Swiss-Prot record:
SUPFAM superfamilies: Protein kinase-like (PK-like) (SSF56112). This is Uncharacterized protein slr1919. One of its GO terms (molecular function) is ATP binding. It comes from the Bacteria. It comes from Synechocystis sp. (strain ATCC 27184 / PCC 6803 / Kazusa). It holds the Pfam family ABC1. InterPro entries: ABC1_dom, Kinase-like_dom_sf, Prot_kinase_dom, UbiB_kinase. Belongs to the protein kinase superfamily. ADCK protein kinase family.
Length: 566
């Protein structure tokens, strides 16, 4: 038998655990021949592609070759390797930077490459784990069961009997990524200021942010920690499955985790044959995605079909936690608010939320933007919220970005990608799926039951417009929230009354009293309609208990604050 191929020699760059632009620059300044050779390869590839685009313009055949050129770009990025595949995937979330025909093709960019040599993979396992492969695993597949741009996966069994997936990183990956990032950073420094891009930041900083995320993704210890944090967030949720990490068989370039028995979400026939209801899988996927964004703020940024499974017992399983991100607390509440503003068609409030989220600069003149949003979103939503389609909204919004000073913050590029992907997966299971039927009841319930000051402020902002109470909005929110079978109105009512009678609820008490008597009449009709919505959820004794629990700690001194002060 021939001797196995040796692993590539260890590079200085393998010792850089976190992205460090200065350390990478110092390394390649001493090795200009490596930089020159890779630069020639990249420039030649893109030069030929750009020449084709120019030729299409000169010959008036842009429309004829539009689809072909988009496919050429996808194939070019795949050929240039892992870094450029990741760049293409990042650009597929940026409708403010990439025209639609290229965007649609980049979305198809698969994070797949042919597997690398098994001998190299097993050598890397032994080097990382400090033991022979047959000492770590009782059994292991002879060939990888999956291969991607950054690594490949084997199926194995531990001596204790657990089935596991063993994820092994591609050899020499860190130096390859570092060289491409160094070239991108050089290009950003030299040419970034000449590019007509609405980025909101210096292009060099964007390359650095991309490098930070890429280095996090190739640190398998970091991925394991992400998986455990994700599992902790969903602890007690019987509908979401997260694989266990086996730390004694894991290191920076090898990760051993629980093998998930189930079906990819694209295997609709197998899902149905197993007796699983696709509509339940869809509901779990959308709800868990919303919980990540609006409750935990820690979200899976790469939910493509290979990373989501329906388990045999009907749960949603997440795998591959290399690409995760964290939202700030205030951002979660603003996202919830913007969804409600969109459904309520309050485009002034929606524009203000866009400013708060960073889609628009604070000094932007929003006067022409409000009717533009109404034109785009109004037609996309249609006459009913049931017509809401996130992909349509995203496509129409991408057109708007070329005419107005919108930019997509990096975090929201990942969120948009995540939501579009999840909606696409849901539609593959059920072509009649409407994301709003799951999402809006959850958001309404989240606002109605939120205990944080930020969520309470958002609820007040939604229910009051120009100082007037919006009875119809409260009625809509209660009606839609009750369509969620998990919504329990009793705790919500108790929370609401506790807040209403608290010191923080002073403003709300006064506004409700004014709302009940505004326009010189008592608004008994509105109150009766709302009572008609909720009365079936209350028994008389329960209602008394809720009211008593809310007011029993309310001081006599606080009674005077219920009434408006003269």
């Amino acid at each position: 038998m021939p001797n196995p191929k040796p692993l590539p020699p260890q590079s200085e760059l393998d010792n850089i655990r976190r992205y460090n632009a200065q350390a990478i620059a110092n390394y390649y300044r001493r090795r200009p021949w490596k930089v020159l050779w890779r630069a020639l390869e990249v420039v030649w590839s893109f030069g030929f592609f750009l020449t084709c685009l120019l030729w299409d313009q000169w010959t008036g055949q842009v429309e004829y070759y539009k689809r072909q050129r988009a496919e050429d770009l996808r194939e070019l990025l795949t050929k240039l390797g892992p870094t450029f595949i990741k760049v293409g995937q990042a650009l597929s979330t940026r409708p403010d930077l990439v025209r639609r025909d290229f965007l649609e093709e980049l979305i198809k960019l698969q994070d797949q490459l042919p597997p690398f040599d098994n001998d190299l993979a097993f050598q890397l396992m032994e080097e990382q784990l400090g033991m022979k492969v047959d000492e770590a695993y009782r059994e292991i597949s002879a060939h990888p069961v999956a291969a991607a741009s950054l690594g490949q996966v084997y199926r194995a069994m531990l001596f204790s009997g657990e089935e596991v997936a063993v994820k092994v990183q591609r050899p020499n990956l860190r130096p390859r990524l570092s060289l491409d990032l160094y070239l991108m950073r050089l290009g950003a420094q030299k040419f970034g200021r000449f590019l007509p891009l609405n980025l909101g930041h210096d292009l060099t900083l964007i390359v650095d942010e991309f490098g930070i995320k890429l280095f996090e993704e190739i640190d398998y210890l970091n991925e394991g920690r992400n998986a455990e944090k994700f599992a902790e967030n969903f602890h007690g949720d019987a509908e979401v499955k997260v694989p266990c990490i086996y730390w004694q068989y894991s290191n920076q370039k090898v990760l051993t985790l629980e093998w998930i028995q189930g079906f990819k979400l694209t295997d609709t026939d197998k899902i149905r044959a197993a007796g699983l209801d696709p509509s339940d899988i869809i509901r779990i996927g959308v709800t868990s995605g919303l919980r990540q964004l609006l409750e935990h703020g820690f979200f899976h940024a790469d939910p493509h079909p290979g990373n989501l499974f329906a388990t045999l017992d009907g749960r949603m399983a997440y795998i591959d936690f290399g690409m995760m991100d964290q939202l700030e607390p205030g951002t979660k509440e603003t996202i919830a608010s913007s969804i409600v503003q969109l459904i309520n068609k309050d485009y002034l409030a929606l524009t203000e939320d866009f400013i708060a989220l960073g889609f628009l600069a604070p000094n932007t003149d929003i006067t022409p933007i409000i009717p533009a949003l109404e034109n785009v979103f109004g037609s996309a939503i249609g006459q009913s919220v049931q017509d809401f389609n996130f992909k349509t909204i995203t496509d129409d919004f991408s057109e708007l970005m070329y005419d107005y000073p919108f930019r997509v913050p990096a975090k929201f590029a990942l969120i948009i990608r995540s939501l579009v992907t999840q909606e696409g997966l849901a539609l593959s299971l059920d072509p009649n799926f409407k994301i709003v039927e799951v999402a809006y009841p959850y958001v309404a319930r989240r606002l109605l039951t939120g205990e944080s000051p930020q969520l309470r402020r958002q609820l007040i902002d939604v229910l009051f417009k120009n100082g007037k109470f919006q009875w119809q909005r409260l009625e809509n929110m209660l009606s839609i929230a009750r369509s969620d079978t998990k919504f329990d109105l009793l705790p919500t009512a108790q929370l609401g009354l506790q807040f209403l009678f608290s010191e923080e609820g002073l403003y709300l008490r006064r506004q409700i009293l004014l709302a009940l008597t505004e326009d010189d009449r008592l608004h008994t009709d509105e109150v009766q309609r709302i009572w008609g919505l909720v009365k079936d959820d209350f028994k008389p004794q329960e209602l008394v208990n809720v009211a008593w629990n809310a007011v029993r700690e309310f001081s006599l001194a606080g009674v005077s604050t219920i009434l408006p002060q003269r």
